[in-house]
Amino acid sequence: MFTTKKSMLLFFFLGTISLSLCEQERGADEDDGVEMTEEEVKRGIMDTVKNVAKNLAGQLLDKLKCKITAC
């Protein structure tokens, strides 16, 4: 009877530790998720700005080319 209680106590203890570690990892993953979305937003904004600048530069070069070649 004593060995059964001892093994049950050990089983409960190990299960509690395992559950605690899983919760800590889940919390860390959730924190990283927020940071990733902020980084993705920053990347999205920078990509948009880069594309707008690229299009404006292309249009300005086309107008300049037209003025030079008198189209």
Curated annotation (Swiss-Prot):
Pfam families assigned: Antimicrobial_2, FSAP_sig_propep
Tissues expressed in: Expressed by the skin glands.
Recorded family membership: Belongs to the frog skin active peptide (FSAP) family. Ranatuerin subfamily.
Disulfide bonds: C66-C71
Name the record gives this protein: Ranatuerin-2PLa
Domain of life: Eukaryota
Physiological role: May have antimicrobial activity against the Gram-negative bacterium E.coli.
Keywords for the protein's UniProt record, in alphabetical order: Amphibian defense peptide, Antibiotic, Antimicrobial, Cleavage on pair of basic residues, Disulfide bond, Secreted, Signal
Signal peptide: 1-22
InterPro entries (UniProt xref): Antimicrobial_frog_2, Frog_antimicrobial_propeptide
Residues making up the propeptide: 23-41
GO biological process per UniProt: defense response to Gram-negative bacterium
GO cellular component, one term: extracellular region
Main location: secreted
Annotated organism of origin: Lithobates palustris (Pickerel frog)
Localisation per UniProt entry: Secreted
